[in-house]
Amino acid sequence: MHGGLKSTLVMLTHKIGTGIKVVKDFDRSLPEIPAHPAELNQVWTNLIDNAVQAMNGVGTLTIKTYREDDHVVVSIGDTGPGVPENLKKRVFEPFFTTKPVGEGTGLGLDISYRIVVNGHGGDIVLESQPGDTRFQVRLPVAEPSST
């Protein structure tokens, strides 16, 4: 998983630019998880790209991994303006975007939600206030049961 996060950061280096500080706080003791790496790389790309855009070239992007009970958590945070309370419930809706026309399709977070929840049996949660927005992706350590 850490390899996918690192490769996503490399891929987005030009977009991240020099005004955004990247903080990586990776728990190296995390177990391997049953996952589709290419799909998760799409999630990391969507979340990191959104965070970078929210900060408008200046701020701190924090990527943290840790274990919480029977899940591995990837937290991607930014120091942008935050998501207004009245929009938090809508961010995972298909075609919902706060970006200007032509700059976003409103599908990135919907796709990310489907990959994490439907494809991996995990969860993705938004916590946001001005200066501290975090998407927390929770992925099960074990295969989801098919019962």
Over which residues does each language-model region extend?
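Core catalytic ATP-binding domain of two-component histidine kinases
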Residues: 1-147
